[in-house]
C-alpha cells in the first residue's frame, strides 16, 4: 500500500450505456484506508459462485460500513490520496438536512450504532402486565458492542441488559435480554 494513500477506492465494472458520462454513471467508492484490514473480497456465497444479483463474480465487502461501500461487480481496487471524483462518491449517499445539498456533507461511511427491540409485543403493540423479557439486537457499526441499556420510561431511567448467545465479533449483531416487571400498556 502506498504510504501516502488515504483511501481505498473500489470500482465496479458495470456497463455504462453509450452517451452517458462514465463519471456520472459508474459506481466507484472511496473509504478510509483503515477499512483494508477487515475488508473482504467475496466470490462465493454459501459455497457457490456469487450470483450476479449479489454483485458477482466479485464483490468488495467493508464490514461496519454502509452497503453502498460494498462495491458490486468489482473490477479495480486502488489506494489513493484523494476520494474518487465520480458522482456517486462526490454527491450521492450523504445524510443531509432537507433542502441542503448532499455534497456539503460527509459521505456515508461508518454505520452508526443500531438496535431493535424484538419482543415482548403482540400485533397490537400492547404489553401484558407482569414479568417480561425485553429481547432485542444491537450492532455497533465499526465498534464492538460493550453493553446495552434499556429504558421502559421514555428515557427517564436505564437498566443494563444481558447479552445472550455467542459473541461473533464486533461486526455481528449481539442479542440481548432484560428481565423486568411492567404494567400493561404500550411502551416506546
Language model feature labels by segment:
Residues 2-188:
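Extended, aromatic/histidine-rich regions of cofactor-dependent oxidoreductases associated
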